Every structure is written in structure tokens, then in C-alpha cells.
Amino acid sequence: MLKIWSMKEKQAAEGGSAKKKVTAAQLRVQKDLSELSLPSTMKTHFPSAEDIMNFELTVRPDEGFYQGGEFRFSFYVNPNFPHEPPKVKCLQKVYHPNIDLEGNVCLNILREDWKPVLSLNAVMIGLQYLFLEPNASDPLNKDAAHQMTANREEFKRNVKHSMAGGSVAGERFDCVLIK
């Protein structure tokens, strides 16, 4: 034990260590990312190679209402991860029952159903599932949810129009079609 302290004192006297301390949250994120098994319809992107706590996910649904679109999400993993879920936001304005106009996402495992045993992979797969099976019973965009349950064909038309950058009910949406 004394030897460790003397080594630390010597290191401090020589200008300290260039190594940054790795937090428990960073270790868990490293583990989750190393175990990712994403389908070909999803891809991660790290704007800063040094910052694994902030990254983006791209989802390209290959079936359902949102087929042909490309949806980008930002992930912010806070220092309390995995005891708190990551913060996830959609970076585009999309017409979706579970995504509001500011990009907030309604996914139960990002709120009350979060458990520390859940991984980033589980969140990413949950996001993909929202595009395959939108959930009108737990909406953030109530207009889209109502349209989906009241008139599915019109909802489908509204989704296609909004994905092309059109307006629905006076609200303009971002073009998310794959180029």
C-alpha cells in the first residue's frame, strides 16, 4: 500500500499522468458499444472520436409506414448511466405519433420502464421498432396518433407527404427521404 502512495507522489511531482480517469458510465458505454449487434438498417456515428458519451444513430426502416426514410437521433449518455437512461432526441422534425415536433421520443424504456440491466442496444432496437410499429396509445404527437387510429390510409398519406418535406395540418416537416 505504501509503495502505491509513493508511486502516486512521484507521478504527481513529475507532472502527473496524461491518462484521464475513466468513469463507470464510460466503461459501461464501452461495453454496450462493443456488444452492439445492429441490423443493416441502423448505423452509429460519433461526431467526436474522444467522446463516446455523445453519438448519433441513423435508422432506415425497410418496411412499414416509414420505409424509404432516414431518421437521425442524438444520444447523450449522462454520468449516472446505467442508473439513468440515455437522453435521446430525433434530430429531424418528423410526423410520428411517438415523436413530438421538438424531437422528444416517447419510448417506455427511456422513461418509467428503464432498468440498469438494459443496454444501449435495447434502446436502439426500441427506436427502430417505433418506426415499424408506431404506438398510438402512448403518443407525444396526439394529432398523428389520432389520425393513425381514425383513418389509417390518411395517416399513411400524411407520413409519405411529411417525409418528402411537406406540411401536415399547417406544420412543415423535414425531408427525410433517402437520396
Curated annotation (Swiss-Prot):
Which Gene3D superfamilies does the entry link to?
A: Ubiquitin Conjugating Enzyme (3.10.110.10)
Which SUPFAM superfamilies does the record cross-reference, listed alphabetically?
UBC-like
Q: Does the keyword Transferase apply?
A: yes
Tree of life domain: Eukaryota
Q: What does the UniProt keyword field contain? A: ATP-binding, Nucleotide-binding, Transferase, Ubl conjugation pathway
Q: InterPro entries attached here?
A: Ub_conjugating_enzyme, UBQ-conjugat_E2_core, UBQ-conjugating_AS, UBQ-conjugating_enzyme/RWD
The Enzyme Commission number assigned here is 2.3.2.34
Task: Give one GO term, molecular function aspect.
Answer: NEDD8 conjugating enzyme activity
Broad enzyme group: transferase
Its GO CC terms are: cytosol; nucleus
Q: Which PROSITE patterns match?
A: UBC_1, UBC_2
**Catalytic residues as annotated in Swiss-Prot or TrEMBL:** C106
This protein's pathway reads: Protein modification; protein neddylation
Could you tell me what this protein does? Accepts the ubiquitin-like protein NEDD8/RUB1 from the UBA3-ULA1 E1 complex and catalyzes its covalent attachment to other proteins.
PANTHER family in the cross-refs:
UBIQUITIN-CONJUGATING ENZYME E2
- Similarity remark: Belongs to the ubiquitin-conjugating enzyme family. UBC12 subfamily.
The protein depicted here goes by the name: NEDD8-conjugating enzyme UBC12
This chain's source organism reads Yarrowia lipolytica (strain CLIB 122 / E 150)
